[in-house]
């Protein structure tokens, strides 16, 4: 049983993997992590899934409970690696808003933006379908309405439950074939290289990635603004304003990431599968650097 945020949920998945395969040191994980093929597509390793089941009770909104993957930091390389198996998904996920009143507000709101990032990049994906769009639009509607309510009244349990349902819908859309993009890819590197909490990585990166991608998916971005209650407005401006309304950081400077680290972040990002699913093609570190400079 795991009770807590997304990192704890993923830790539970990794513990189950260790129990199944007798992993007891860092080198033991190498055979089980996913790798990129020459086309930039993630290829999971083949292995027996864990026989020990997991019950997850999330207290944040990062939505890692609902998928078959787990992210784990490799402290040897400062890279965040992905592990995937259908049996890594928790057998039961319990959404109870009551315990979440004890979650620090910055964690609740920033992981809410993480869920909004899932829905936004999924809705803007070139792989989006009618099924995924249905989930993502409803996720954006719920999250954009409920997160400010919780900020105003931390004990508003109905609003907290709406946030949790929005979180679930924000990841359910991936079952319809949509993929994430550069906000997720760069965010993974910000976490691995600089230790930025992944809720904050979405706060900082998502608006700038939307602006970078506008030439490739302006029509899809209009759906984001519409779902958030701002039809006809620029999606990046809507998302940035929403993050500002919640009192969350919007620049790399605000999360203590300086230009001296940009090259390492960009290099790490080139090994992330989501970069190659970004709507605007990104093939070199300089493409990542362009977004980092905009977010500085």
At which residue positions do the language-model features occur?
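Gly/Ser/Thr-rich loops at beta-strand to alpha-helix junctions
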Residues: 5-9, 61-63
